[in-house]
Amino acid sequence: MTGILNIQFKPTIGKKDINLKKVEHFLKQNCDKKLDLVVLPEFFSTGIDDKSFINSPEDETGGKTIEFVCKLAKKYNTNIVAGTVIEKYNEKLYNTSFIINRNGEIIDKYRKIHLYNYMGGNEGNIISSGDKLVTVNLDFAKIGIAICFDIRYPQLFKELTKMGAEIIVLPTAWIVPNEVYKDSTSLKYAQEMWIAMNRTRAFDNLVYFVLCNQTKEINSNLSAIGNSMIISPTTEILANAKNEQCTIYADIDLEVVKYYKSIYPITQID
């Protein structure tokens, strides 16, 4: 069995040191578990904060933020998908997820392709799109990486599956306007839609789907809806963080992926 841990929390806006301490706090709480993969949310070190994105991006190595996460990976003997940080490269900013192995080594990174420029979102005004899909061979499985709004583009996930992904990981900061967040009926609908999208991606591709979201109010206009989940290839929700600042954990059996793909050879159908 393979142990997966999601860390869902509310980053303190612009305070990298505080947020990194939160990550380590949650890891310490779970050090007695079998940690094969730990996943952090999108923008885990800064929160959603244009000022931080522009004024204090990390360099192409991930800077001190990813250096710290690399130390955590080695200390706790786990692979980590380090949510996302804002990376500056060749005078452009990217929303980048670094993948780190148990030795504390960066083994790859994925730059978000589909930026959120809708319903008041302005990500594309600040950040540039990536142009490469990424799968990574870890010591227990091949994983594919996508970020947040990528989920609205099913073909991306189909391609990751064709590339051999058995697990797809989605760091995210999935948000709604505060008027939606504060209305129980509207929030329930938004969360149900979010859950349905993620379960569909798992089932369409017969993979384990691991998504890690922020939670709670981000600013006076927006809130993150939580519901970080670990989902099986048959859409079973193995763990759900709801709307709390917490961790969720599940043991997964990768033989399930092989079994269902042997029955339904979906990558051979186009």
Place the predicted regions along the sequence by residue.
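CN hydrolase (nitrilase-like) catalytic-core segments centered on the catalytic cysteine
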Residues: T61-V81, R152-T247
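Residue-level recognition of beta-strand->loop/alpha-helix junctions
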Residues: Q8-K10, P41, R111, N213
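Short beta-strand scaffold segments in enzyme catalytic cores
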Residues: A82-T84, T96-I99, V134, S228-I230, ...
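Short, conserved active-site loops that position catalytic residues or coordinate cofactors/metal ions
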Residues: N6-Q8, K33-P57, P171-A173
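Active-site catalytic loop in hydrolytic enzyme cores
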Residues: K88-K182, S186-A196, L254-I269
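N-terminal active-site segment of His-dependent metallophosphoesterases
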Residues: M1-L37, V169
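Short glycine/acidic-enriched loop and turn motifs that connect beta-strands
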Residues: E87-Y89, E217-I218
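Short beta->alpha transition motifs characteristic of CBS
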Residues: T46, F98, Y110-Y116, M229, ...
